[in-house]
């Protein structure tokens, strides 16, 4: 009977070690991706890694809680040999995490109770909880239950209700300023509030607000002036421009006014 239990315990430990090794490999792979491939890592890939690690942890928990699993809690581990010297075989088995199995390391690795500091804090919290009266504790429990109920009710509400409330709030809240809108309409329609300033540029005399046209010679004027340059001696005076005639361009071209009966070869 004892040999059978020992074999079951060994088989259980081998299965547990294999599953822990798989979990360890998944963690190492995920940490490597986070440290070296973070620029190419996508959020769906991160979720897949988390799902894989969570599934492996759930499998280990199911294995430990299974009724057919031998009672490993009744097993006691006793250190048979303690040495302050470095143990290469132990370092190899623990991947150089525990190179020495000495008196300082054994309490940390084989402890079945919390640290003394943690145990003292637990005792202090237990004493504070014992000092609270039943009525005060009941009131605190009711307040906490009410808070949790309200939170669960908000979380369980349909999404449509939340969307309708949000749309109602948006409709009730104005999205514009009426004063600014009225000022803009008055400025565009009636020129209210606009400053009275003239556009840049010279203004023709007698017509304020109307810019004077450019008086530079055009291409046609330059051509005519070049063609009639040899008749400058035969040209007559140019009639001066009358002021107050808008749109009339003063010309520098000398015109040749002749009689209809005049001919250059008449003797």
Curated annotation (Swiss-Prot):
Molecular-function GO term, any one: RNA polymerase II cis-regulatory region sequence-specific DNA binding
Record pathway: Protein modification; protein ubiquitination
Residue runs in coiled coils: 2-27, 118-163
UniProt cross-references to Pfam families, sorted A to Z: Med8
Annotated Basic and acidic residues bias: 156-165
Start-end of Low complexity biased regions: 236-247
Keyword Ribosomal protein tagged: no
Subcellular location: Nucleus
Source organism, top-level taxon: Eukaryota
UniProt cross-references to InterPro entries, sorted A to Z: Mediatior_Med8_fun/met
Regions of compositional bias (Polar residues) in chain numbering: 166-180
Annotated stretches, region: Disordered: 156-180, 227-267
GO annotations of cellular component type: core mediator complex; mediator complex
Keyword Isomerase included in the entry's annotation: no
Any one of the GO BP annotations: protein ubiquitination
Keyword set, alphabetical order: Activator, Coiled coil, Nucleus, Transcription, Transcription regulation, Ubl conjugation pathway
Protein function: Component of the Mediator complex, a coactivator involved in the regulated transcription of nearly all RNA polymerase II-dependent genes. Mediator functions as a bridge to convey information from gene-specific regulatory proteins to the basal RNA polymerase II transcription machinery. Mediator is recruited to promoters by direct interactions with regulatory proteins and serves as a scaffold for the assembly of a functional preinitiation complex with RNA polymerase II and the general transcription factors.
PANTHER family: MEDIATOR OF RNA POLYMERASE II TRANSCRIPTION SUBUNIT 8 (PTHR13074:SF9)
Family, as annotated: Belongs to the Mediator complex subunit 8 family.
Oligomer and partners: Component of the Mediator complex. May be part of a multisubunit E3 ubiquitin-protein ligase complex.
Protein name as catalogued: Mediator of RNA polymerase II transcription subunit 8
Organism of provenance: Danio rerio (Zebrafish)
Lineage, uppermost ranks: Eukaryota, Metazoa, Chordata, Craniata, Vertebrata
């Amino acid at each position: 009977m004892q040999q059978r239990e020992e074999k079951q315990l060994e088989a259980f430990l081998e299965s547990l070690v294999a599953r822990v090794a798989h979990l360890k490999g998944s963690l190492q792979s995920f940490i490597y991706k986070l440290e070296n491939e973070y620029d190419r890592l996508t959020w769906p890939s991160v979720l897949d890694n988390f799902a894989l690690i969570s599934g492996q942890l759930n499998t280990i928990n199911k294995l430990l809680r299974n009724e057919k699993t031998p009672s490993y809690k009744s097993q006691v581990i006793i250190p048979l040999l303690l040495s302050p010297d470095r143990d290469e075989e132990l370092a190899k088995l623990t991947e150089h995490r525990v190179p020495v199995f000495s008196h300082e390391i054994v309490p940390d690795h084989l402890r079945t109770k919390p640290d003394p500091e943690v145990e003292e804090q637990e005792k202090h919290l237990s004493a504070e909880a014992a000092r609270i009266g039943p009525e005060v504790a009941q009131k605190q429990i009711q307040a906490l239950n009410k808070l949790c109920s309200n939170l669960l009710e908000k979380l369980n509400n349909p999404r449509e209700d939340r969307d309708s409330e949000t749309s109602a709030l948006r409709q009730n809240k104005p999205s514009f300023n009426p004063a600014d809108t009225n000022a803009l309409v008055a400025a565009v329609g009636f020129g209210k509030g606009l400053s009275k300033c003239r556009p840049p540029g010279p203004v023709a005399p007698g017509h304020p607000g109307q810019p004077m046209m450019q008086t530079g010679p055009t291409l046609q004027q330059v051509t005519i002036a070049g063609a009639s340059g040899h008749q400058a001696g035969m040209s007559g005076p140019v009639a001066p421009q009358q002021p107050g005639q808008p749109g009339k361009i003063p010309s520098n071209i000398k015109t040749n006014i002749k009689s209809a009966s005049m001919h250059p070869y008449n003797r």
